[in-house]
Amino acid sequence: MDYKHFKGKHANIVIEIISLLEKGVKKAQEILEKPDAGSYTKLENSSGDTPIKADLALDKFLEENFLSLENIKSVFSEEKETPVTKENGSYLIAYDPLDGSSVMEANFLVGTIIGVYEKDYKAQNLVASLYVVFGHKIELVVALEEVYRYAFYQNKFHFIETIVLENKGKIIASGGNQKDFSLGLKKALEGFFAENYRLRYSGSMVADVHHVLIKKGGMFSYPQKKLRKLFEVFPLALIIEKAKGEAFYFDKGVKKRLLEQSVESYHEKSECYLASPHEAQILEKYLKGE
């Protein structure tokens, strides 16, 4: 892989993680392709969810590999109660080993989300984000100074493009239970669809956000506090912001940046809106004051 795009203080650790992922893709594929990979276990993770077999197998594989990196001090999986910490190192990794696992049996797109933190697990300390999506092809998206997209081919990640969102998109990925949506959100969504926006929601956050990115705009929304800040929300928020979009939530009707949220507990959850500037502006108009 050509690493010419990665510059600055945190470039080296990102390159190390990508190199590790590049070498581990085939093993990850093997885990996902097993006939019983989508079968539910009898366990319960720290968030109260029941993981599938592929969740746990990928988690074990990734944890071992991340801990092998000299400059990684702490590794924290969504599947674990607390981080695994080493004596040395400068960076911390929080990751969701298999986002979208609930739709894997339907053969939908799933992926691994990775946030790279410095010093402590806080939004303000997030220095880079990555995700890998597994489908009929495998792609990697990385956010450092900008957002870069790669495709896996012949055992290597090959650069496709630098992703920059346009001011306005045409797709909406609206997750959550619609009967619980606020009146403002319902009106905003009705307005988008009246303007011929297309609904593109799969139940896999990483897949839906990836769709918004490769289409160069639109909106992903999940108004209920279900998504985990450290493992899903913050890493994908950074990617959207670096792609010139907006990542936000509403606090008593006031729009605020997701990456300015505090973290009171490791598995704390949040509502989440990731959007192009136009969609963010429209949503704020409808939800302001709610």
UniProtKB/Swiss-Prot annotation:
Substrate binds at D99, G100, S101, S102, Y201, K226. Binds 2 magnesium ions per subunit. GO terms for cellular component: cytosol. Its main location: cytoplasm. Mg(2+) 2 binds at D96, D99, E232. Mg(2+) 1 binds at E78, D96, L98. Pathway: Carbohydrate biosynthesis; gluconeogenesis. It comes from the Bacteria. It catalyses: beta-D-fructose 1,6-bisphosphate + H2O = beta-D-fructose 6-phosphate + phosphate. It is found in: Cytoplasm. Its cofactor is Mg(2+). Its EC number is 3.1.3.11. GO terms for molecular function: fructose 1,6-bisphosphate 1-phosphatase activity; magnesium ion binding. Signal peptide: none annotated. Keywords: Carbohydrate metabolism, Cytoplasm, Hydrolase, Magnesium, Metal-binding. HAMAP family: FBPase_class1 (MF_01855). Belongs to the FBPase class 1 family. NCBIfam families: PRK09293.2-1. Homotetramer. This is Fructose-1,6-bisphosphatase class 1.
